[in-house]
Amino acid sequence: MAGGRRPAGGAEGEPGAKRARAGGEGGMAAAAAWAAFRALGSPARHVAPMVDGSELAFRMLCRRHGADCAYSPMIHARLFVENQKYRDSYFTTCGEDRPLMAQFCANEPATLLAAAQLLEDRVDMVDLNLGCPQRIAKRGNYGAFLMDDLQRVEAMVSLLSRELKVPVSCKIRIFPEDKPYTQTLAYAKMLERAGCQLLAVHGRTREQKRAADFRADWDAIRAVREHVEIPVLANGDVRHLRDARALMEYTGAVGVLSADPLLRHPGLFDDSVHDAEGNPTHKPWSCCDYAEEYLDLCIQYDTPHRIIVLHMYRFLGDWFKEHHDLREKFSKLHKHLKGEEKFALMREVCDELRERIKACGRSTPVPKLSERALARLEREEAVKAAKEEQDREAQALAEVDAMKARAEGAAVGAGGGGSGAEAATSAGDQGK
């Protein structure tokens, strides 16, 4: 495990682990959960699941720099089962990519199980996304919006726990206006009883979508950790190694997750670029170094172009706010180039930006736009990215429905119902 201070007691000394050894059916299940966590190596520093963010190349970058466990991007269970193209593009891994959690979103137990069984031999745990607060999750009735249907959640977790060969984990958010956290604690306990063996708690509600606007409730995470007997991971406000240590110390969680801050600084968990207190000591131009290292990994692991572009903007975006000409250069080159030429010119932008950062003698950029204008641009980019992901999901679902309609039409035609086949084929074509 990458270095850092373990919270009081550590994994072996957690109150949950002690209660698990007390015996009884619940205690036996909790003991199994702790055994499963230790079998992973008791990882404390986790790359959180991120749509278009935690793909293989980025996971491997973070592992090089201190992360000791990672989640896949959120995988749509129905699409993973029914759409081969989606399945091939949304999950890739390699032998060094361990321990690894595959995260699924779903609202139907049988479909979730079928999807998970396709991957259970390639991952260490299967995770159920119960925390996504975005509009796409509301429309699809998954993620944090299943907090309104806990009976369905219980059925999904219970089925996975009974049928999979690997442990089941869950990632949740907390209920709003819930102090002293009655609903949240009951939710966590239900998941534990259903068979969840590792629980990640994001200390924000589903209404608190933008992390920059709301502080995470560490007290809620601590309350959950004290209430259940299984290992708990904490998520929220981890921007530096110091934050990770503080969150573990405060909540007693066995580990932490980080998402957006890792996108900007993949060395967030790296002891070598932090001082003894966990304060960052990396050079201002380290963003360029990470970007070029990431490009090498993208070639090695054949990463989709749109994913590369998103990551490059995250790495370099803060300094692009000062150096607009380089942002424009990058924007134009990635749209019109392919292959080795594209990567060469991306590196050229990185090299030029690195020299400018060194020359300016500052550790932070001086944006050309006002804070209000920058905030507006960030909101617009977030909305655009969410809309693009929603459109991709809708298109993939339409392709699945179209294939089903054509298959049903062919079956009807083979049975002598030609008109039915034509109708089904027509319906399928309209779904393209």
Language-model-detected regions and their locations in the chain:
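Alpha/beta catalytic cores of nucleotide-metabolism and tRNA/nucleoside-modifying enzymes
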Residues: 2-46, 51, 56-60, 64, ...
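Glycine-rich, positively charged N-terminal anion/phosphate-binding segment
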Residues: 23-39, 50-120, 329-331
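Conserved beta-strand positions in the central sheet of alpha/beta enzyme cores
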Residues: 70-71, 101-103, 127-129, 169, ...
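Short glycine-enriched, charge-decorated loop/helix-capping segments at active-site entrances
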Residues: 141-147, 210, 273-280
